[in-house]
Amino acid sequence: MARGPKKHLKRVAAPKHWMLDKLTGVFAPRPSTGPHKLRECLPLIVFLRNRLKYALTGDEVKKICMQRFIKIDGKVRVDITYPAGFMDVISIEKTGEHFRLVYDTKGRFAVHRITVEEAKYKLCKVRKITVGTKGIPHLVTHDARTIRYPDPLIKVNDTVQIDLGTGKITSFIKFDTGNVCMVIGGANLGRVGVVTNRERHPGSCDVVHVKDANGNSFATRISNIFVIGNGNKPWISLPRGKGIRLTIAEERDKRLAAKQSSG
């Protein structure tokens, strides 16, 4: 009988979006417990070794982290299996680089470089609002932050902008039709579009209809929607492709056009 937490993760069972080869080993890094779920995070080691190619082995990643070069959301992290997740800002002081973890249209975390100015804040989705001891209102975000005394106008599913230096809310975006959003779960993961309407289903999941910049419409659960800007202007920079998913035929035509122009 197994007692206690699981400490290993087989490569075959690792999330697909980490893009680890099946045959290069038996095990994958098991993310530590942290603000993001195992299936929805990217361990620091995978980001530094497999994405940025700054290290060849896990030992090298450890040496980089132990020199306190890597910051996530403005805090130094030395744990190589720390689970970084959606909207987290990863800063590497030594190279002066800043990255934000956002999904591409294939549902993988894109290596998305951002400016120093943009690295000072992040957006968080409001998961729940509760009243704590002595009637103090609390707000809980998607990355497990608890913020006391929020603006009473902020409701669940809204998005708050957090200053990473102070951890305080600087602004917020209402969940409303006409606002631009990103899909953070389900089959449409990584797509960006404008909320067109919300179907309410009491006792079940509300369904949200979204229209992307090419005019394609799709629907998903409200829990998969993350509002990223007012109107159709996002508050963060988007990775290449701007969250517009192409059909297989469109991708092929784009590839052929690129080939002809370079050839």
UniProtKB/Swiss-Prot annotation:
The keyword rRNA-binding applies. Keywords: Ribonucleoprotein, Ribosomal protein, RNA-binding, rRNA-binding. GO terms for molecular function: RNA binding; rRNA binding; structural constituent of ribosome. GO terms for cellular component: cytosolic small ribosomal subunit. It comes from the Eukaryota. GO terms for biological process: translation. The keyword Protein biosynthesis does not apply. InterPro entries: KOW (IPR005824), Rib_uL2_dom2 (IPR014722), Ribosomal_eS4 (IPR000876), Ribosomal_eS4_C (IPR032277), Ribosomal_eS4_central_region (IPR013845), Ribosomal_eS4_central_sf (IPR038237), Ribosomal_eS4_KOW (IPR041982), Ribosomal_eS4_N (IPR013843). Residues 42-104 form the S4 RNA-binding domain. Signal peptide: none annotated. Belongs to the eukaryotic ribosomal protein eS4 family. This is Small ribosomal subunit protein eS4, Y isoform 2.
